[in-house]
Amino acid sequence: MTRRGLTLLELLLVLGILGVLLGLALPLLSPNRLALDQAARSLATQVTRARLEAIRRNAFVGLQVFTEGAGGYLLFVDQNANRRYDPGEEFGATHFGQGNWARVRLDPEKSALGNMPLLFDPRGIPAKPITATLVLTSGGATRKVVISQQGRARLE
């Protein structure tokens, strides 16, 4: 006689394994964590966008980080060639602490760009080759956006 079905022990073992996997995956799927990942990816993408806009426009284009409030960044075209952001030069801005990114913050103590813009020359090369790290936080989670001396951004 052959038995069909599962024993109680097998069923409990499967439920236990599923519970452990769900417990490990649940923190990664929280809305705060997803918003933080999305904000970090967006920031890295905007660094690339600034580089490509500098080449496309044949002008100095930069990314200016600001730490007021929850922080944020803006893209600008340096129209007067002073190599810094002036009001009216921006063509894209993102503010953390609003909308989908309501709990995302730029950590000014751990971010190493300060008030200096990340500026790309018309060839898409950083005007000042620096390595910068921008740290975004949401609750207890953090994501780093590291910008290399060549102007390429990566997530950590």
UniProtKB/Swiss-Prot annotation:
Residue ranges of the propeptide: 1-5
Cellular component GO terms held in the UniProt record: cell outer membrane; periplasmic space; plasma membrane; type II protein secretion system complex
Pfam families linked to this entry: GspH, N_methyl
Subcellular location: Cell inner membrane; Cell outer membrane; Periplasm
Keyword terms of this UniProt record: Cell inner membrane, Cell membrane, Cell outer membrane, Membrane, Methylation, Periplasm, Transmembrane, Transmembrane helix
Keyword NAD attributed: no
This protein's name: Pilin-like protein PilA1
Native organism: Thermus thermophilus (strain ATCC BAA-163 / DSM 7039 / HB27)
Gene behind this protein: pilA1
